[in-house]
Curated annotation (Swiss-Prot):
Name assigned to this protein: 3-dehydroquinate synthase
UniProt-listed InterPro entries: DHQ_synth (IPR002812)
Top EC class, one word: oxidoreductase
NCBIfam families documented for this protein: PRK02290.1-5
MF annotations from Gene Ontology: 3-dehydroquinate synthase activity; dehydroquinate synthase activity; NAD binding
Entry EC no(s): 1.4.1.24
Length: 328
């Protein structure tokens, strides 16, 4: 998730309140105590959670020398950069070499440019505005700025009941939508998209915040390209939710339910890539077709095409590494 900071120098309580309500990650202020009276949000100030000149740096890019200084500072912490006439080239140069650049912006249009420069975008933005409505607009821009995951259609090759085991329901703090899901796999090299419980069913009410994701051993894809075992997820963790067209956003875990249930193995293939996932054997568990519609594992047949993602390399504590790791 991209960082959303708001510059409140000079202090304005109405803007601070709007920023907090809009999900700002941090407020840049002259006195952190003013922020603490309003809520639990990171304050960037001399007496704050992050201290300017120590944890966070600010610099205006005016020439190649200041650009190089920004890169040097980025090795010590996050760097807020200002580009006088808001030219993109300095941002491109910085983003190409550092993932600790925060762009100073004045509106949602500038934020969108910063967050998409060189496709990867800056680490976040610092918004300076007098308009509460602009704060809300930028918050929406941030929410839609998640990286895209390359999704491919996999052809189902095998569906086999495997007996009883422990499966994991991931209950998020978000209402999830039709046509999106979490990416889960038996190995860290390939994942299937598991649909949330958004659809009507004669047996149980929809639970649009929930994804019945798979067995406890499975990997789930997280923001930033990391993975975690489903069994290791906990309240407050962030998981990656992907739309069937590729864009992603984060969701906060509100609860994890592990229960013993009958399980089903699904295997599929896309070119040379293979994917497998052990899921609960029940009609409410669904994968995602190419057009974004959901298909129940109870109705799934060999030859069906469902969406998934392929990753390269192995994993060490959830982080991608370049070494030979065989998972099967």
């Amino acid at each position: 998730m991209k960082l959303f900071w708001v510059d409140l120098r000079p202090w304005r309580k109405d803007l601070a309140t709007t920023a907090i309500e809009s999900g700002a990650d941090a407020l840049v202020v002259e006195d952190a105590e003013r922020v603490r009276k309003l809520g639990r949000v990171t304050a960037i100030a001399e007496n704050g959670d992050l201290v300017p000149g120590k944890d966070v740096f600010e610099i205006e890019i005016v020439d190649k020398e200041s650009e190089e200084e920004a890169l040097r500072l980025s090795r010590e912490g996050l760097v807020i950069v200002r580009t006088g006439d808001w030219t993109v080239i300095p941002l491109e140069n910085l983003v190409a070499q550092s993932d600790r650049i925060v762009a100073a912006v004045g509106n949602a249009d500038e934020a969108k440019v910063a967050l998409t420069v060189l496709e990867r975008g800056t680490a976040g933005i610092l918004l300076a505005t007098d308009d509460p409505a602009e704060v809300r607009r930028v918050a929406k821009t941030i929410a839609g700025a998640g990286a895209s995951v390359p999704l491919v259609p996999f052809e189902v090759t095998r569906i086999v009941p495997v007996g009883m085991g422990d499966r994991v329901c991931v209950d998020t703090c978000s209402i999830l939508a039709d046509g999106e899901g979490m990416l889960v796999g038996n190995t860290s090299s390939a994942f299937l998209m598991v649909h949330p419980e958004t659809l009507e069913n004669p047996y149980v009410a929809p639970r649009p915040f929930r994804v019945n994701a798979g067995a406890v051993h499975a990997y789930i894809l997280l923001p930033g390209g990391k993975t975690a075992y489903l069994a290791d997820l906990a309240v407050g963790d962030r998981v990656l939710v992907a739309e069937h067209t590729g864009p992603t956003h984060d969701a906060v875990v509100g609860r994890v339910k592990i229960e013993r249930r009958p399980l089903l193995l699904v295997e599929a293939k896309a070119g040379d890539a293979t994917v497998s996932l052990v899921l609960q054997n029940a009609e409410t568990i669904r994968l995602v077709r190419e057009d974004g519609t959901a298909v129940s594992v109870a109705a799934l047949t060999v030859g069906d095409r469902v969406l998934g993602s392929v990753a390269e390399g192995g994993r060490h504590f959830g982080v991608a590494v370049k070494e030979t790791i065989l998972e099967k």
